[in-house]
Amino acid sequence: MQWEVVIGLETHAQLQTQSKIFSGASTRFGAEPNTQACAVDLALPGVLPVLNREAVEHAIRFGLAVNAKISPASIFARKNYFYPDLPKGYQISQMEIPVVVGGHVEILVGDEVKVVELTRAHMEEDAGKSVHEEDFTGPYGEPSSGIDLNRAGTPLLEIVTEPVMRSAAEAVAYAKALHGLVVWLGVCDGNMQEGSFRCDANVSVRPKGQVEFGTRCEIKNLNSFRFLEEAIQYEVRRQIELIEDGGTVVQETRLYDPDRGETRSMRSKEDANDYRYFPDPDLLPVVIDDAWIEDVRSKMPALPAQLREQWQSEFGLSAYDAQLLTQDRDTAKVFEELLAIVGKPLAKAAANLITGEFASSLNRAGIAAANAPLKAEHLASLLTRVADGTISHKIAKDIFAILWEEAIAGKAISTVDQVIEAKGLKQISDSGAIEAIIDQVLAVNQKSVEEFRSGKEKAFNALVGQIMKASQGKANPGQVNELLRKKLG
């Protein structure tokens, strides 16, 4: 039997605010346990929540970015459940009327652009954190646990998709696109190690062609793209094997164990009725008028999708390159700065340089584009010298590596022209000089000449390689190809 996978994601993005969603306590990560929890966070008697305006504006900004409807009046509700790190005994969330309704996120899967529809995005407060450490002991030295309430009350935007993804690859592509978008907007810092961006995956399987959904399981708190992919792949295999062996999938919440590469049962999955949602009597509806929405819109940066569309249509960039260039605002900024110097004719070359050598060097060094030691003017000089024929693409890569090493070492960065002069890297474009090198190579490679003349095109490429080697990579590749073909008849 053929099976179809059905996936929906719920993503919790911590909103980038200085204070919590309903109190003035700090949201700074890494403070000593329980030093950033005030009376409101601790649910002490006599205190009332006050909504953080900046958190609402972040939610509006996200809604606009995904072409969603912004609710003119959204309501906060109490989600009732007991857990040690939830001081109030309920979580303030949104149920019936969330702040953001609908919307979509574009993703690139292979060469195909797909659209992931969103159900909603709602504001809520984060819970505290249970701490289970080996060296954390009770008064008699027994193994114990602790509660850190610093995170309690941190503003969250929970972003829920429709169950429209059909593979782990699609889910990861969506998660990466969403992560890039919220960081781009300044809505969330995107730090997955610190829990600022984490996903819950709802996974089910059904026979190919069946309309009804299968029983879903929710995998909680996946805080890396790799874990998300591995957890979904395992869960799909588990459910299919279970059904094919005559078993039944139980609706439940599961955790992913990365050490063992498997999901395991955590608890039975609750429905909305189990949480007994009701409107929070301490909070008024959030009224968002058109003037507020337009004020937020006026302060938004150009969106990744807008830039991708512009660059593809105006400069002829591929969807893949446009996607890479808009992974984060800093990379896009470098491209725009480079483009402002070299102009439209070198747009594709600029994109290739940034997505190639520049991006690879950043990744190897673990450096963000914002902190790149080489700036747009260095890259522009390199592109200009390739364009005017002074150096070849291969030599340009060598010069880039030299400049990068100087910058990383904290040395004064040479100009491109200085490196060309000092190392004698100027491209040979004189046809007479190139012909002399070709003649030398042909004289000692008669076998390749005969193979080419007998119809083997690979032999031609081998000869080009020998000529470039003999010229130490300096011969103009275009002229080499042209002159060699003439000589070979």
Curated annotation (Swiss-Prot):
SUPFAM superfamilies in the record: GatB/YqeY motif, Glutamine synthetase/guanido kinase
Coiled coil, from the record: none
UniProt cross-references to InterPro entries, sorted A to Z: Asn/Gln-tRNA_amidoTrfase_suB/E, Asn/Gln-tRNA_Trfase_suB/E_cat, Asn/Gln_amidotransferase, Asn/Gln_tRNA_amidoTrase-B-like, GatB, GatB_Yqey_C_2, Gln-tRNA_amidoTrfase_suB_CS, Gln_synth/guanido_kin_cat_dom
EC nos: 6.3.5.-
Annotated catalysed reactions: L-glutamyl-tRNA(Gln) + L-glutamine + ATP + H2O = L-glutaminyl-tRNA(Gln) + L-glutamate + ADP + phosphate + H(+); L-aspartyl-tRNA(Asn) + L-glutamine + ATP + H2O = L-asparaginyl-tRNA(Asn) + L-glutamate + ADP + phosphate + 2 H(+)
Transmembrane segments: none
SMART domains xrefs: GatB_Yqey
Keywords on record: ATP-binding, Ligase, Nucleotide-binding, Protein biosynthesis
Signal sequence interval, chain numbering: none
Keyword Protein transport: no
Ligase found in the keyword field: yes
GO molecular function annotation: asparaginyl-tRNA synthase (glutamine-hydrolyzing) activity; ATP binding; glutaminyl-tRNA synthase (glutamine-hydrolyzing) activity
Pfam families: GatB_N, GatB_Yqey
GO terms of biological process kind: glutaminyl-tRNAGln biosynthesis via transamidation; translation
Domain of life: Bacteria
Quaternary data: Heterotrimer of A, B and C subunits.
Function: Allows the formation of correctly charged Asn-tRNA(Asn) or Gln-tRNA(Gln) through the transamidation of misacylated Asp-tRNA(Asn) or Glu-tRNA(Gln) in organisms which lack either or both of asparaginyl-tRNA or glutaminyl-tRNA synthetases. The reaction takes place in the presence of glutamine and ATP through an activated phospho-Asp-tRNA(Asn) or phospho-Glu-tRNA(Gln).
Family as reported in the entry's similarity comment: Belongs to the GatB/GatE family. GatB subfamily.
Protein known as: Aspartyl/glutamyl-tRNA(Asn/Gln) amidotransferase subunit B
Source organism per UniProt: Polynucleobacter asymbioticus (strain DSM 18221 / CIP 109841 / QLW-P1DMWA-1)
